[in-house]
């Protein structure tokens, strides 16, 4: 059994009592559900135990637990999990503003959009109302997936339970996809590295992240916060810092302010250098950002046969994207 809350009353219902679809991958016939709800609770505390014909205890426990989370879909809210970096947006005006920040196609030729971390669908509901986009979703949280299945049944065929960072975007979206979301704080940087990796598939992204990360991404050379993500994203995308979001509009509230930024792929189809080497040069340069580039790059690529570049007396934060392109070409010729 799985308990949530106290002071509950127990009811027994046949499975046919519940008028919502089962998850598409359920293979088990459930005979009866013992359902326990805390009456009068705004959040709705639930207990669910699934009785079926499976004899293997471990299989029964796993299947029961999954169905329990599915039942949680009729709860008023999903529990935010610190381990997943979840801070659920509660302000509908902010959600609509984020939705409106993403460009679309047309009703006749809508763009594919992937929402990363759908949570309880606060942003999802506005995306689904647009006829110039087709919205897909991915979320690693079983409880959130259950909630979305129950509250947005028409969204179910386009909703995937899984890790965006491990998702094969080329397989699911061979013609490209725009990415949007209230990105989980603990993987926001990793999400942007994945966008860089799949830049040929992702023409645009709108994301809500920590304010300090957003500022760092939009920063120009010469600043102490200018770093790897700044250079790599600005090499292929135009960055717009759209607006700041108060910590008070989240549940639970984070300890820092958030911000929404927009990335739109620029006209640079290909850099005028080896792009894989460009990424390595940028990462190596900022790997020891307090040192001059001479030391940082020689640690990564060798002594360049004694050759020197004028940039060697500078630090990584002093170089623009164009400077890094030039430096990459030099490294390619001299290593």
Protein language model regions, located:
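Positively charged N-terminal leader segments that act as targeting/secretion signals
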Residues: 6-13, 39-41, 58-67
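Catalytic cores of RNA-modifying enzymes
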Residues: 66-284, 322-329
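C-terminal lobe and adjacent flexible extensions of AdoMet/dcAdoMet transferase-like proteins
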Residues: 284-335
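Polybasic, lysine-rich low-complexity intrinsically disordered segments
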Residues: 28, 33, 52, 61-62
